[in-house]
Structure formats: C-alpha cells, structure tokens
C-alpha cells in the first residue's frame, strides 16, 4: 500500500483538519484497456486517488470516484477520520484504513475490482501499530474479491471495530 504513495492524486502527510468534500467527481481515467475483460489482472497500476499519512481530523465526503487503478482512499496512521457519501467504481481496493484510529465510514456505495473495505495494520509507518475504534455503517459494497477484509499486509492488529447495516452485492 505504501508504494508510489507520493504519486497519488491527493497526498497529505502530517496534516491537521483536512477536508476533501463537496459534490465533486474525480475520474482518474485509468490505464486499464476498456476493451479488456472485466476481472483480468491489471498489469499497469496507476496512482492512488487519495493517500494520507499521519493526519488528524480528516473529512472526506460527497465525492464520486471513478477509474482508479490503485487504492482509491488509503490512509495510514490517521486519527479521527470521517468518510461519508462516497460513490466509487474503481479497479482495486475502495477504502483502506491502515493503522488508523477513530474512523467512521458511512453512507457509501462502492463497486471495486478487488476489496471493498480492507482494514490493514501494515509496517508502512516503520513501526507496529493497530487499527482501533472503527465504525462502518450504511454502506453498499459490490466487489470482485472481498467486500470486507481484515489482514492484508498486517503486522499489528485490530481492536474495537463495529460493522453494521452493510449491503453486499
């Protein structure tokens, strides 16, 4: 998840009070060949859409995100994150909290080529840490892999995670 972090469309490191909100469309016009067969492995991965590291008080809401060939919304070591009203159709993972705490993900609709929401506890921050105090609710997830997943790149752990009212297609 940490590879090519700085090449993401929206990058934030050690930021406070970050908001990416509004009735906006982000279409990354992927490198995927539209003539290809859905579900084929993507050979060329482009940049992540939104990538944040060690940020506090993050709000991401009311966005449409399309054609991302890497992680759509990835955040590592962040605290107090609110993600809501996201509609996405992407080729890899949708939302990936990594070693983050006090996270709320709600009222989102996603169609992903890989995992819908994947909780990670990787070594991307060069230390062991955990995902903690996460609440996910009122989301619709259509995925070619795991709609909800715990454990990719996990070295730390998970604590106090509540998932409710999820519709998996």
Regions found by a protein language model. Give the residues of each.
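Extracellular/periplasmic carbohydrate-active domains that bind, remodel
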Residues: 1-169
């Amino acid at each position: 998840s940490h590879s090519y972090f700085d090449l993401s469309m929206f990058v934030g490191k050690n930021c406070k009070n970050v908001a990416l909100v509004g009735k906006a469309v982000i279409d990354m016009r992927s490198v995927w060949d539209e003539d290809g067969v859905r579900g084929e492995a993507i050979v060329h991965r482009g940049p992540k859409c939104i990538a944040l590291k060690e940020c506090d008080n993050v709000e991401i809401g009311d966005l449409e995100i399309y054609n991302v060939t890497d992680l759509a919304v990835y955040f590592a070591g962040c605290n107090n994150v609110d993600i809501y009203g996201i509609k996405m159709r992407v080729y890899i993972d949708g939302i990936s909290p990594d070693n983050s705490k006090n996270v709320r993900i709600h009222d989102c609709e996603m169609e992903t080529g890989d995992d819908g929401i994947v909780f990670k506890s990787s070594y991307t921050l060069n230390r062991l840490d955990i995902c903690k105090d996460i609440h996910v609710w009122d989301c619709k997830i259509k995925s070619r892999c795991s709609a909800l997943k715990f454990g990719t790149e996990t070295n730390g752990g998970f604590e106090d995670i509540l998932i409710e009212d999820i519709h998996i297609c």
